[in-house]
Amino acid sequence: MSNIYANSYLIIFVFLCLGVLLPIGALTAGRWLRPHVPSDAKATTYESGNNPFHDSRVQFQVRYYLFALLFVIFDIETVFLYPWAVVYDQLGLFALVEMIIFIVLLAIGLIYAWKKKVLRWM
């Protein structure tokens, strides 16, 4: 019986090693095989064949990052809510209480962001 478990872990270990070593090997082979000829033209912005008219490094305001961070947080909330809603009948009262606590904590975070005026654009 323990041989079955050992084989299961062996398969996981093999896939883990392949998942780490294959990308490292591909990146290393690409670095060794590619021609490396740096030039100023390669460092400029590609403007669909036109000459670039300004620097490609544009500074974004912090508001964009805050909106993106809030979107990711509440998007992941829906990822956790969907499987729970699908199997709600089988989980019982304990899972309902856990999910209510989860939603309340996220609501507290949303209220905090609202009070700090993170959601205000201008």
Curated annotation (Swiss-Prot):
It is a multi-pass membrane protein. Keywords: Cell membrane, Membrane, NAD, Quinone, Translocase, Transmembrane, Transmembrane helix, Transport. The keyword Protein transport does not apply. NDH-1 is composed of 14 different subunits. Subunits NuoA, H, J, K, L, M, N constitute the membrane sector of the complex. It is found in: Cell membrane. It comes from Geobacillus kaustophilus (strain HTA426). Its EC number is 7.1.1.-. This is NADH-quinone oxidoreductase subunit A. The chain crosses the membrane at residues 10-30, 67-87, 91-111. It catalyses: a quinone + NADH + 5 H(+)(in) = a quinol + NAD(+) + 4 H(+)(out). The keyword Transmembrane helix applies. One of its GO terms (molecular function) is NADH:ubiquinone reductase (non-electrogenic) activity. It comes from the Bacteria. Pfam families: Oxidored_q4. Its main location: membrane. InterPro entries: NAD(P)H_OxRDtase_bac/plastid, NADH_UbQ/plastoQ_OxRdtase_su3, NDAH_ubi_oxred_su3_sf. NDH-1 shuttles electrons from NADH, via FMN and iron-sulfur (Fe-S) centers, to quinones in the respiratory chain. The immediate electron acceptor for the enzyme in this species is believed to be a menaquinone. Couples the redox reaction to proton translocation (for every two electrons transferred, four hydrogen ions are translocated across the cytoplasmic membrane), and thus conserves the redox energy in a proton gradient. One of its GO terms (cellular component) is plasma membrane. Belongs to the complex I subunit 3 family.
